[in-house]
């Protein structure tokens, strides 16, 4: 999410989520740092612009609108349809959705004039946005690439970018995801032969896993299914929802009697159906992960079946994806993925496309966006290679504050942009301390020590009972430390210590040192001292 503020008015562009990695145990979603938008700032927001319908750009919209549901939202027809489905799931009412098309202009408040530009991406109806203000003109590309043969025929509008460049662009905010990749991204049309070969070789069950928003990929699978006389069955709540929306709006063309419901699956032989599933990133609760773990109640995979992972591997998801691949392989399935076949192309511009964009726009200044630090740096180098002055290439991480004055951007500060963690029904209640506790529990184990003392007599009346979880060693290994705990407690009480909390710290310190020295572990320790 990016935030633009001028003369007491604010504009937001995109409002997405991230999915947790292994260092966020138990976390469901990571929201952008919405804490910056306190009630006073939230009242200044004149609009939220959504560039496209991927989760990392729209996923946090319901959480924002729970605080202020009447924020006007601008986006393409498909993007807003996907957002509306989310808002209904969250039971949010009173929202204001404004459908825009490429070439449209909109005045937002008194400070922002918007123009929308068609861009090509891995989801239909993506838009870039030009924002004109008294401080200067900027373009935010959103996610884009320059596929010259897109499946839907909708190319990135290079003439619009060139025209805006002629008018003068002060700040060009450009997708950096593939800035390290040389050349141009392959066209979506080039993967069709590989998908065809998968269908030709699959003589039993066939499962295709892809992003639930990848309408183009699902369209290719539908076309291939018709050609090979297979029905199509969507599996996964988000897949079913998104494809229904795409079909209703005309973005997905489904021949009659092609799609069947999950409950109808048993009525067909394995070689008469292709299952289109969520879970291409190994998400633990996704349909594909449950199939790989033999936990799906309706679908099983066995010897001779085929699974096609028609997606890229998002950094950070490697372990989860390979666990699913290994699980499917162990069950006897043949797994086809990007590592062994051309079954996916990226939706983000590679270095050659970025250079082309810089040369036709010729911006005064550039701010790389989207991606890790190395991607931002690579994109910055591309901008400088096309002649953008080095001092006008702005590199910032999340929370960076930029001032655009008379068309010149400068980094002037940083705000706290810490992620808000969603844990079940709790939003923002999970703290870093709790996450640390979870990591310790998962990596180092847990020890509880319960004992009773008589502080007046300075004696331990009940020997410490130690319970361990997450240790390879048997509980009997802790027998040698109990005598030391008793000694340390009685010495502390003889010295006048009679507070239960302080005595618990004695226990924690004593067993903690012993475990670190003897077992090379630093577990979570919960001591309980009962005074009698």
Predicted regions and their residues:
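His/Asp/Glu-rich metal-coordinating catalytic cores
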Residues: 1-49, 54-268, 286-300, 319-323
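A glycine- and charged-residue-rich anion-binding loop/surface
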Residues: 12, 18-22, 27-30, 44-45, ...
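Short glycine-rich phosphate-binding loop at a beta-alpha junction
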Residues: 72, 367, 526-527
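Conserved hydrophobic residues forming the short capping helix/wall of the S-adenosyl-L-methionine
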Residues: 87, 383, 515
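Conserved beta-strand scaffold positions in the cores of enzyme catalytic domains, especially
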Residues: 97-99, 171-173, 335, 393-395, ...
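Broad gene-expression machinery/nucleic-acid interaction feature
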Residues: 111, 126-128, 444-448, 461, ...
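Hard-cation-handling environments
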Residues: 180-310, 314-497, 504, 509
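C-terminal tails and terminal domains of large nucleic-acid-associated
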Residues: 496-532
């Amino acid at each position: 999410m990016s935030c633009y503020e001028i003369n007491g008015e604010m504009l937001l562009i995109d409002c997405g989520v991230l999915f947790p990695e292994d260092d966020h145990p138990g976390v469901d979603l990571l929201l952008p740092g919405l804490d910056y938008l306190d009630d006073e700032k939230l009242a200044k927001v004149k609009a939220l612009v959504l560039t496209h319908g991927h989760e990392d750009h729209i996923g946090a919209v319901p959480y924002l609108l729970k605080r202020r549901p009447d924020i006007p939202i601008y986006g393409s027809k498909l993007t807003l349809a996907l957002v509306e489905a989310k808002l209904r799931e969250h039971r949010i009412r009173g929202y204001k959705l404004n459908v825009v098309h490429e070439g449209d202009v909109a005045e937002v408040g008194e400070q922002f004039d918007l123009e929308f530009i068609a861009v090509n991406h891995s989801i239909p109806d993506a838009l870039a946005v030009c924002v004109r203000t008294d401080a200067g003109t900027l373009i935010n590309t959103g996610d884009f690439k320059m596929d010259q043969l897109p499946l839907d025929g909708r190319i990135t509008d290079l003439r619009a970018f060139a025209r805006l460049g002629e008018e003068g662009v002060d700040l060009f905010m450009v997708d950096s995801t593939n800035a390290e990749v040389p050349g141009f991204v392959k066209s979506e049309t080039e993967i069709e032969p590989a998908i065809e070969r998968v269908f030709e070789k699959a003589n039993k069950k066939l499962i295709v896993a892809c992003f639930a928003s990848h309408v183009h990929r699902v369209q290719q699978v539908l076309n291939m299914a018709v050609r090979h006389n297979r029905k199509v069955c969507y599996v996964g709540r988000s897949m079913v929802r998104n494809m229904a929306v795409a079909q209703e709006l005309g973005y997905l063309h489904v021949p009659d009697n092609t799609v069947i419901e999950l409950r109808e699956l048993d009525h067909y032989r394995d070689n008469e159906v292709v299952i289109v599933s969520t879970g291409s990133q190994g998400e633990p609760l996704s349909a594909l992960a449950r199939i790989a773990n033999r936990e799906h109640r309706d679908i099983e995979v066995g010897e001779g079946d085929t699974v096609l992972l028609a997606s890229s591997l998002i950094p950070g998801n490697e372990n989860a994806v390979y666990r699913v691949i290994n699980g499917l392989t162990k069950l006897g399935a043949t797994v086809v993925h990007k590592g062994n076949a051309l079954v996916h192309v990226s939706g983000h511009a590679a270095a050659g496309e970025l250079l082309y964009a810089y040369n036709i726009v010729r911006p005064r200044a550039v701010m790389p966006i989207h991606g890790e630090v190395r991607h931002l740096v690579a994109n910055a180098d591309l901008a400088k290679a096309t002649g953008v002055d080095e001092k006008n290439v702005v590199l910032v991480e999340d929370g960076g504050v930029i001032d655009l004055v008379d068309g010149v951007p400068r980094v002037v500060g940083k705000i706290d942009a810490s992620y808000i963690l969603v844990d079940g029904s709790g939003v923002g209640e999970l703290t870093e301390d709790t996450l640390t506790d979870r990591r310790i529990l998962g990596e180092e184990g847990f020890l509880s020590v319960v004992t009773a003392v008589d502080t007046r007599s300075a004696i331990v009346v009940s020997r410490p009972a130690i319970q361990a979880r997450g240790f390879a060693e048997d509980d009997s290994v802790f027998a040698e430390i109990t005598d030391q705990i008793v000694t340390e407690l009685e010495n502390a009480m003889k010295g006048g210590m009679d507070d239960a909390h302080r005595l618990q710290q004695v226990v924690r310190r004593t067993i903690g040192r012993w475990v670190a020295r003897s077992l090379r572990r630093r577990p979570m320790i919960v001591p309980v001292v009962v005074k009698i």
